[in-house]
Amino acid sequence: MATAQLQRTSMSALVFPNKISTEQQSLVLVKRLLAVSVSCITYLRGIFPECAYGTRYLDDLCVKILREDKNCPGSTQLVKWMLGCYDALQKKYLRMVVLAVYTNPEDPQTISECYQFKFKYTSNGPIMDFISKNQSSESSMSSADTKKASILLIRKIYILMQNLGPLPNDVCLTMKLFYYDEVTPPDYQPPGFKDGDCEGVIFEGEPMYLNVGEVPTPFHTFKVKVTTEKERMENIYSGILSPKQIKTPLQKILMDKDDLEDEQEHYINDDFDIETKMEEQKKKLGSSELGEPNLVCEEDEIMRSKESPELSISHSQVEQLVSKTSELDVSESKTRSGKIFQNKMANGNQQIKSKESRKRSQLESGKTVLHHFDSSSQDSVPKRRKFSEPKEHI
């Protein structure tokens, strides 16, 4: 038991550094927070098969970390995208990463769910913040506080992903990168990305918005937000959010409005009732270990850490992804976290209208139509800003 605990402590230290006193240490933390966040989301949403993940422990929380796997070209492609994000982050160009889920391989602009990761940089470097309503963003935090905030953010992502209704069985991924235009060279593109040609997207169904959290260091700030279909939020209302935190969303998704969206409360608050939810899960599952609900964790499974700037992926692998993105066999009413949902949620492909009729009904009703991820509330007409999209989609 003591050996297992020592092993977990060692693995946790490998994920998040214990000391954040230099810009390089802060950059490492931000990179790893992004990697762990994306890994948690894709794992619990059933995007890739089990073989595409290694295992780590953050204190008592078991997390799955995405890795390259020859049997899962999609995970290799996403790792390649992440390396492109790291390049832009290191140069202090990157402002926001949008990871989007869509169902029609021919129409990546019509999305079903998306996750935003937003970065800010101080004069000394970059920062990732987790700030509660009563906490000042300017308050100094120790390395221990930063690490606690980082782990809390991952816990919140886990709780949210485990309680969202399931995605359709076959989904695809795309990613958009947005920059600080005033410092980013006009011709800059991270490895694996090209200049984007369609900034706006259309959302399937009625969207709901969640501020998940932030994490601070003396050098960077990183925010996590989620937009999903209202129907998938059914379990969230009763299980995680208090009534005062449920807000009526805007019809139009305004993803990034120069930080004004928080003041105008366009998103649901980020104060999840984590302690209550974890206790409920422990009772239901009979688990004696906090933070590991329904996750298969092997003590000896270690993630392969690859920092290679060059990742190869064949054209045939990409074609295979287009035809069949997810190799995971997900049942109609059960998510990877093990939670059972009503068939009306899981059977999304049968219940949702055709793409054209859905778009038509949205336009007629005035509901969610084309929106810009990067529009400013101060501009009457959204300003065209530089952004990138992948050369190859998943």
Curated annotation (Swiss-Prot):
- List where Basic and acidic residues composition bias occurs: 353-362
Where Phosphoserine occurs along the chain? S376
Tell me which UniProt keywords the record has, alphabetically: Chromosome, Differentiation, Meiosis, Nucleus, Oogenesis, Phosphoprotein, Spermatogenesis
Residue ranges occupied by any HORMA domain in the UniProt entry? 24-226
SUPFAM superfamilies in the record, alphabetically? The spindle assembly checkpoint protein mad2
Show the InterPro entries listed in the entry. Answer: HORMA_dom, HORMA_dom_sf, HORMA_MeioticProgression
Tell me which PROSITE patterns the record gives. Answer: HORMA (PS50815)
Localization (cell): Nucleus; Chromosome
**Renumbered ranges of motif Nuclear localization signal:** 383-386
Sequence ranges of Polar residues compositional bias: 311-325
| Gene Ontology biological process terms from the UniProt entry | blastocyst development; meiotic cell cycle; meiotic DNA double-strand break formation; meiotic recombination checkpoint signaling; meiotic sister chromatid cohesion; oogenesis; regulation of homologous chromosome segregation; spermatogenesis
What does the record say about PTM?
Answer: Phosphorylated at Ser-377 in a SPO11-dependent manner.
Pull one GO CC term from this UniProt entry.
chromosome
Instruction: State the protein's purpose.
Output: Plays a key role in meiotic progression. Regulates 3 different functions during meiosis: ensures that sufficient numbers of processed DNA double-strand breaks (DSBs) are available for successful homology search by increasing the steady-state numbers of single-stranded DSB ends. Promotes synaptonemal-complex formation independently of its role in homology search.
Which PANTHER family does the UniProt entry name for this protein? HORMA DOMAIN-CONTAINING PROTEIN 1
How is this protein named in the record? HORMA domain-containing protein 1
